[in-house]
């Protein structure tokens, strides 16, 4: 179209009346030139592809012939497989446990009938003894063998057989259900042990020595009074055996018995009796001067060596003491008399 700008009106009219000029002008346009170029490129590409296809023609023909041959072989193998399968079914049907069981039962019945017929002939005298023994023993042996086989086959037939499951017929196994995730539990706080409550000690509502009779109630404050002096072995050092001391406290000195002055503070809940400067202890052997911890004569003892308050009967069992009129009731079960120094299991003194 760029060349039409320079032409005059007369030239344009002449070109309009000339079809060759119009065709030449159309062929010289850039759009037509691009189309022609694309056409030539497509033709060249098709030509190269055709040449490549021609190169593959030989191997393709050879492969086609090989495929035809393999297909013919496959058809022959299929026919042969069908024949072998038919033979296998024929043989397997004859070897089924049920079929074999029927055949063995029939053969067993036949051999049994033959053996019975042989026995009848022998009884009638038609068969000699030697022939009868040989044939009859072999027939009966075969009969028993077949009976055993029949019984075994019957067990096999009755027993359920676990047939192998085909992989295609078995449905896929379901995955196991997901297990619930245990929730995290908060750590349990350790329980603190209960604090011991402080209880005010109070006197016991019962007598510490239930085996002794209860005396009259004292009125007013009790005055201290000594215990009577009785004989005691000089080698006595305290109760024997694995029994704990009545009151926890520091151990007494060697050679002295227990006394309230050397013991610890009284335990709460147990009533204690007022003591003098020298607490009650075990009496000394006659003639020995009392030391610390042994009973001494009180300066406040009234006339007649009698305490000003009612007393209870003394504990029986110590040598040298008068027996009370009340029958003794020991704090331990009656039985063999314990040795000297035996520590009773219960409280012996009503005031300790």
Swiss-Prot record:
Please describe what this protein does.
Component of the ESCRT-I complex, a regulator of vesicular trafficking process. Required for the sorting of endocytic ubiquitinated cargos into multivesicular bodies. May be involved in cell growth and differentiation.
Subcellular compartments: Late endosome membrane
Question: Origin organism of this chain?
Answer: Mus musculus (Mouse)
Q: Which domain of life is it from?
A: Eukaryota
- CC annotations in GO: cilium; ESCRT I complex; Golgi apparatus; late endosome membrane; nucleoplasm
Please list where the region (Disordered) is annotated. Answer: 162-352
Using the record's annotation, list all stretches that form the VPS37 C-terminal domain. 78-167
Organismal lineage: Eukaryota, Metazoa, Chordata, Craniata, Vertebrata
Q: Which residues carry this modification: Phosphoserine?
A: 29
Q: Could you tell me one molecular function GO term of this UniProt entry?
A: calcium-dependent protein binding
The chain's coiled-coil residues are none
Protein name as annotated: Vacuolar protein sorting-associated protein 37C
Q: Which Gene Ontology BP annotations are present? A: catabolic process; protein transport
Recorded family membership: Belongs to the VPS37 family.
Q: What is its main location?
A: membrane
Q: How is it modified after translation?
A: Phosphorylated by TBK1.
Keyword annotations for this protein, in alphabetical order, are: Endosome, Membrane, Phosphoprotein, Protein transport, Transport
């Amino acid at each position: 179209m760029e060349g039409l700008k320079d032409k005059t009106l007369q030239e344009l009219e002449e070109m309009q009346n000339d079809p060759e000029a119009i065709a030449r002008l159309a062929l010289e346009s850039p759009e037509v030139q691009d189309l022609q170029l694309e056409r030539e490129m497509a033709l060249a590409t098709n030509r190269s592809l055709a040449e490549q296809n021609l190169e593959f023609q030989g191997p393709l023909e050879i492969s086609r012939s090989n495929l035809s041959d393999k297909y013919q072989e496959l058809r022959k193998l299929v026919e042969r497989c069908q024949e072998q399968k038919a033979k296998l079914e024929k043989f397997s049907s004859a070897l089924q446990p049920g079929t074999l069981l029927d055949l063995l039962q029939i053969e067993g019945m036949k051999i049994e009938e033959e053996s019975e017929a042989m026995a009848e002939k022998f009884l009638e005298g038609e068969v000699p003894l030697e022939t009868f023994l040989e044939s009859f023993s072999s027939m009966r042996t075969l009969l028993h063998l077949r009976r055993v086989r029949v019984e075994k086959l019957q067990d096999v037939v009755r027993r359920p057989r676990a047939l192998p499951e085909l992989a295609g017929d078995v449905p896929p196994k379901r995955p196991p259900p997901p297990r619930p995730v245990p929730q995290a539990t908060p750590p349990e706080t350790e329980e603190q042990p209960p604090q011991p409550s402080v209880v005010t000690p109070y006197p016991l509502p019962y007598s510490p020595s239930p085996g002794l009779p209860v005396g009259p109630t004292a009125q007013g404050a009790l005055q201290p009074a000594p215990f009577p002096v009785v004989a005691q072995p000089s080698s006595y050092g305290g109760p024997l055996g694995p029994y704990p001391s009545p009151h926890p406290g520091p151990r007494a000195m060697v050679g002295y018995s227990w006394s309230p002055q050397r013991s610890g503070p009284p335990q709460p809940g147990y009533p204690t009796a007022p003591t003098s400067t020298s607490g009650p202890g075990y009496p000394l052997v006659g003639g020995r001067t009392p030391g610390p911890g042994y009973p001494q004569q009180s300066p406040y003892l009234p006339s007649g060596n009698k305490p000003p308050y009612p007393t209870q009967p003394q504990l029986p069992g110590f040598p040298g003491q008068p027996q009370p009129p009340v029958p003794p009731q020991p704090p331990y079960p009656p039985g063999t008399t314990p040795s000297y120094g035996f520590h009773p299991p219960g409280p012996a003194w009503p005031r300790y």
